[in-house]
Amino acid sequence: MGNTKWTDEQLSAIETRNCNLLVAAAAGSGKTAVLVERIIRIITNEENPVDIDKLLVVTFTNAAAAEMRERIADAISKELENNPRSKNLQRQLTLLNRANITTMHSFCLDVIKNNYHRIDLDPSFRIGDQTEGILIKSEVIEELFEDKYEEEDIGFTNLVEIFSSYKNDNNLKNLVLDLYNFTMSGPWPEKWLINSAEAFNIKQLDELDRTNWVRVLAQSVKIELDGYVKMLEKAIEVTSKTDGLEPYMDNLLMELSYIKKAYESTDNGLEAMFNSLSSVQFSRLKSIKKDKVSDELSQNTVKKIRDDVKKGISELLNNAYSVNPQQMLRNIQGSYPYIKKLIELVLEFSARFSKRKRERNILDFNDLEHLCLKILSDYDDENNIIPSSIAMNFKEYFDEVLVDEYQDSNNVQETIINLVSRKNDDNPNVFMVGDVKQSIYRFRQAKPELFIEKYNTYDSSNGVNRKIQLYKNFRSRREIIDGVNYIFKEVMSEVVGELEYTDEEALNLGADFKENKFKDTIVGGPIEVNIIDKSHNETVVEDNEEQEEINNVILEGRIVAKRIKELMSKSEDEQIFKVLDKESGEYRPLKYRDIVILLRATKNWSEPLLDELSAEGIPVYADTGSGYFESIEIRTIISLLKVVDNPMQDIPVISVMRSPIMGFSAEEISDIRLVKKDNYFYENIKYISEEAYNSINESYSDVLIAKCKYFINSVDKWRNKSIYMAIDEFIWYLYMDTAYYGYVGAMPNGVLRQANLKILFQRARQFEKTSFKGLFNFINFINKLIKSSGDMGSAQVLGENEDVVRIMSIHKSKGLEFPVVFLCGLGKNFNLMDLNKSILYHDELGLGPDFIDIGKRFSIGTLAKESIKKKMKFETLSEEMRILYVACTRAKEKLIMTGTVGNLEKSAEKWLGSASLDYNRISPSEVLKGKSYLDWICMSLCQHRDGSVLSESFGTENLILKDDNSRWKVSFWNKGDLIDKTKTEVLEQGEGYELTIINNKPYDNYLYEEVDKILSYKYPFKASTTIKSNISVSDLKRRHAEEDYDTEQLYREKVKVVPKFLQEKKGLTPSEKGTAVHFVMKKIDFNRVSSTEEIKEQLHELFEKEFLLSEELKVINPTKILSFFRSDLGKKILDLNCRGEKIYREIPFYTEISSLEVDKTLDNIYKDEKIRLQGIIDCFFEYKGDIILIDYKTDYIMEGHEDEFKEKYRKQLDYYSDAIFKLTGKKVKYKYLYSFYLEKEIKII
């Protein structure tokens, strides 16, 4: 291909033939160029040319297939320029149009179209829209459940009882749909479902020991125990080096021996593992006087390590090994009946869904792969799957099968490739290229294991199965490459990442960046890590996680804006940052379009970042991939469509009224509402319109009457039009008839808004091709699309060369490159929410349910669930590791990272602890403990000489630092440093005003009397001014409890300033203790309250996150909290939680009461004076149709005085009950006080 200079490895990948070849192509190694060159050389081989249509080239996306076809066409054209008479080249250019350069779905579609008769398929079938599929599924699942209810099948009834809430059966329906969707990513879904159910049909413990569940659980426990061994060995090392800690040594050595024994037992079955773990004991450490220890810091380090090991062993015993092996077996056996019934339900749904699609003659994308498999596969006499005659034809026809982005293949695609290729024959012909370190689509059921299995078994030199590694990176500067290599050698392993990042995997510099010889030019530079510490200047603990995340974005956005401005302008030394121009080969000043900001997810991040950068005058664009249905123009049109379909809907009607289409003012809408409050808005509009026509009602303005008449006439006209017009035509008609299309074009971002409206029109056109028709179905279609998170994303109106900073997700950046990359949000925790589902599923391990005893209303995780949970966590974190790799390797010349932590000192202590266990690398068990990208990065940097700032600032010991080639710049930022001080500065500067006499003429007597009258005025309702407009329930309760009170004193602000020298800390007051307990009950995870150990663990987590003070942690008794969850009320809450029902905690409310309820000494003239009552309801929930209210109390109370206690708080609970009724429309049936002092519930009613 021209004069390209290929490396030896690239050349080998291009020229190697007659084998299955796996090319492991690292980021920026030129894999696409290699793939294209290989194809060109195959079709232009002088001795044995192959026609291009005899190659099957499988790509990941349609865009990639189009790009591949274009590249091949360009290459052939260039060859033709050198050899214009070549008939072979002319032939290949002609054949290119029918070449099999395609996605797997497109290939499957071609196979089906050419062989439809073999599967009894109507040849006029069409591919259904994704949302059309959702609508059909919804129809089928509703019909299926209705039939099952009519059959009164006890097995189905039990499923409903287990998985559904008291309100509806949506949880079970969603489970059936999710499980169906999951299985369709496998080649044989029916077989997988049946085998997954039968896996629970186990009779003996030795059968359970042989399952994959036990194997995976043993592997994961082994990793954890290995980490605990390293931790205790570190503690022993510190103890041996610290004078005075000798008394700890015996305990540590004994505990280490216990854990090593448990480690060795992991391969000996469940009984051995359970017994070994249960025998691990931690004796009380001997006390040591402070003056006997040479280094108190070392003593604290040893204690903390030991406490962490104890906590880890406790977690194993409370989760995976919470019951003995025999009970584990019984729980598996007990789950079999309902799992079998669930699978039967999924299979019946699958059959009905397939039948419904056949009736409508449509296929979905899953059908393409599975019907293709049906055509390509057959069975031998022993019922083994073999290639069909059609597949055999493909084997003979295709000279070579080339698979791009092989790391993203799934099991279905792998099976199809195996059937149409000679992969397993004597003359293999499959070429696979990809980079498993960039496999980031597991959520689409991609299987990186397929790549890894071949990578570990294929030979590097010869044989029928070979591999070649392309390790040279032609994209990035050395600073980027060295930095990426350093981090991933530290943290990527077979455990987290599913691949060891060895020297073989490391990137090698391949790009030629010319030397900078200009003193006024800055190029490259170290990778920057900016860590924001939120613990400084923090006055309020942010309780709203979404708002806290937005606050983090704002802080990081300010750092990003600051650095962009610095990079784009000259420094104090008159130097300017430059990047290498690809075309000229010379350094040029940085442009905004050279910069990208990468995010793990754009939700809650892109908008605040846009605002921050825009405020600093930085042109910026965010491709969020969402927000389409939230745009004002789309919301308005959808509301208009809803009104046309059914005008008896107040919210859409008001939306249209307030829009430019109708132009009603807020006052006019208010007038319409007051016509008849119980009517629909549309009825009131029609009433005003008709009264105006009959000249009966003259109380409305002519303008309002005219608007109402126009509204009614327009809606009537549009409703008539909608009956006979296609939905796409009707939508375009609305755009034109209302002039709304032109109106939005004149708004800010008008081009984008019009493009959004065009997308809706095109979506309607696609809808017209579905089996659903009419306006109602289209609205339902849009609602389903929104509900299924199928936001279409705003229209793209940004040109590729627009000079703006781009904000995008890491996934969208894959395959792209940018001179400067900002990687933000690194402190955000990984999303592991999927691990908390009631039932887990895994393609290898099957189903992982809870064992549920319906009679006792009790549930516990099964061995299967614990095993799958461990496996899913490893796989999820491995995926996150690869996503971080993709993000870092997008940078060509500069990489800048930002992340926020709640408390830098605590985070640094954790990072340094992880880094200190193993000098060679971060232990996989420590990597597994990482909760964010920032954890992984900073653990690694703690061992780097440039990360010494971490150990110097927060270190507990002297770490041996690595002299690695990578260069880093670690910076710390306090929250206060980034808060906008503009307002403060203005207030401090102030402005001086000179007072002058405007008019000094003498006043007359009349004026004097008027002024005196005004100044002497006495307010007739002075008594009401003594009462605040707001009052809390607690104050009101206290007011009713006091016979003698001073109203003014009760509601006047009380400020008691105690001098610091008189402030004496005497522990928490009863009120402070109560506040702490209430906070814990608000935050506690109901899934982890089965033991005091689990509750203690949660309390420590709240302390570590700084939600609890150390004093509060000491006074909260986990045993008393456990007692609550073992009470009848607690059991009801856990039952609801198990079902996914809503439990309302710490619900603030506001309501109005008469001022006479506050102060009965007021005259009756104040009875209509309203005061806002505010309070917080501790807990309420709906249980079997009844609303139950709980108020937590930590007061001291004597046994036997419960009646007095009830009377004390009765009025308070009455207020709460009224508030709940106003919130829910349902009356409270039962009111309870729960006394943590007595550890009992006290029923009010």
Curated annotation (Swiss-Prot):
Q: Where is the UvrD-like helicase C-terminal domain?
A: 517-815
Per UniProt, residues of the UvrD-like helicase ATP-binding domain are 4-477
Tell me if Electron transport is a UniProt keyword of this record.
Answer: no
Gene Ontology biological-process annotations: double-strand break repair via homologous recombination
Cellular component (GO) terms are: cytosol; DNA helicase complex
Q: Organism's domain of life?
A: Bacteria
Q: Which UniProt keywords apply?
A: ATP-binding, DNA damage, DNA repair, DNA-binding, Exonuclease, Helicase, Hydrolase, Isomerase, Nuclease, Nucleotide-binding
Catalytic activity from the UniProt record: Couples ATP hydrolysis with the unwinding of duplex DNA by translocating in the 3'-5' direction; ATP + H2O = ADP + phosphate + H(+)
| EC identifiers of the protein | 3.1.-.-, 5.6.2.4
Which molecular-function annotations from GO does this UniProt entry contain?
Answer: 3'-5' DNA helicase activity; 3'-5' exonuclease activity; ATP binding; ATP hydrolysis activity; double-stranded DNA binding
Residue positions annotated to bind ATP are 25-32
NCBIfam families reported in the protein's UniProt record = addA_Gpos (TIGR02785)
What quaternary arrangement does the UniProt entry report?
Answer: Heterodimer of AddA and AddB/RexB.
Q: What does this protein do?
A: The heterodimer acts as both an ATP-dependent DNA helicase and an ATP-dependent, dual-direction single-stranded exonuclease. Recognizes the chi site generating a DNA molecule suitable for the initiation of homologous recombination. The AddA nuclease domain is required for chi fragment generation; this subunit has the helicase and 3' -> 5' nuclease activities.
| Name under which the protein is recorded | ATP-dependent helicase/nuclease subunit A
Which species is the source of this protein?
Clostridium beijerinckii (strain ATCC 51743 / NCIMB 8052) (Clostridium acetobutylicum)
Gene that this polypeptide is encoded by: addA
